[in-house]
Swiss-Prot record:
A molecular-function term among this protein's GO annotations: ubiquitin-specific protease binding
Protein name in UniProt: Selenoprotein S
Coiled coil: none
Region spans: VCP/p97-interacting motif (VIM): 78-90
Assembly and binders: Interacts with DERL1 and (via VIM motif) with VCP, suggesting that it forms a membrane complex with DERL1 that serves as a receptor for VCP. Also interacts with DERL2, DERL3 and SELENOK. The SELENOK-SELENOS complex interacts with VCP. Interacts with CCDC47.
Gly residues: compositionally biased ranges: 160-174
Miscellaneous remark of the record: One of the histocompatibility antigen responsible for chronic graft rejection.
Keywords assigned: Cytoplasm, Endoplasmic reticulum, Membrane, Selenocysteine, Transmembrane, Transmembrane helix, Ubl conjugation
Post-translational modification: Truncated SELENOS proteins produced by failed UGA/Sec decoding are ubiquitinated by the CRL2(KLHDC2) and CRL2(KLHDC3) complexes, which recognizes the glycine (Gly) at the C-terminus of truncated SELENOS proteins. Truncated SELENOS proteins produced by failed UGA/Sec decoding are also ubiquitinated by the CRL5(KLHDC1) complex.
Name of the gene encoding the protein in the UniProt record: Selenos
GO cellular component terms listed in the entry, alphabetical order: cytoplasmic microtubule; Derlin-1 retrotranslocation complex; Derlin-1-VIMP complex; low-density lipoprotein particle; very-low-density lipoprotein particle
Organism annotation: Mus musculus
Location of region: Disordered: 115-190
Subcellular location: Endoplasmic reticulum membrane; Cytoplasm
Pfam families found in the cross-reference section: Selenoprotein_S
Length: 190
């Protein structure tokens, strides 16, 4: 029985010695290069993540290309929808351009009519300046101008008579008061 016990006890001693050697070796390796190993592991993890994302995107692109190759009807429908959208947008743009042109034509017509009226009023000897400030009310949908009475100068008496103006010193008698100069009147300090 001693023989059976001897190989068993020798074997664990050998295993513990190899474990101790492994522990010492790994410990000294980590003590010397631990930070380098840690940073290289982190960097390797980041690189693997980036590469996996790119591989997924590449596979997705390949699948999309395969679908478009297999289904040309889908491509044709997309192109037709795109062409229809472009045509609609162009029609809207053309309609806006036509509205703008019509507006410009109306403005030019209005200017031309005002110039003709100004010329006619100059030929008749009237002043043309009074009509230039107000818009033409004949064409507008507003109230009729025949019911509006123009305001003239009223016959009211002014509140203050005599033409006295306290800000300028004009009027109000023979003398005019002026305020004195600022500062000491003697011109210096004591």
């Amino acid at each position: 029985m001693d023989r059976d016990e001897e190989p068993l006890s020798a074997r664990p001693a050998l295993e513990t010695e190899s474990l101790r050697f492994l522990h010492v070796t790994v410990g000294s390796l980590l003590a010397s290069y631990g930070w380098y190993i840690l940073f290289s592991c982190i960097l390797l993890y980041i690189v693997i993540q980036r590469l996996s994302l790119r591989l997924r995107a590449l596979r997705q692109r390949q699948l999309d290309q395969a679908e478009t190759v297999l289904e040309p009807d889908v491509v044709v429908k997309r192109q037709e929808a795109l062409a229809a959208a472009r045509l609609r947008m162009q029609e809207d743009l053309n309609a806006q351009v036509e509205k703008h042109k019509e507006k410009l034509r109306q403005l030019e017509e209005e200017k031309r009519r005002q110039k003709i009226e100004m010329w006619d009023s100059m030929q008749e000897g009237r002043s043309y300046k009074r009509n230039s400030g107000r818009p033409q009310e004949e064409d507008g949908p507003g109230p009729s101008t025949s019911s509006v009475i123009p305001k003239g100068k009223s016959d009211k008496k002014p509140l203050r008579g005599g033409g006295y103006n306290p800000l300028t010193g004009e009027g109000g008698g023979t003398c005019s008061w002026r305020p004195g100069r600022r500062g000491p009147s003697s011109g210096g300090u004591n």
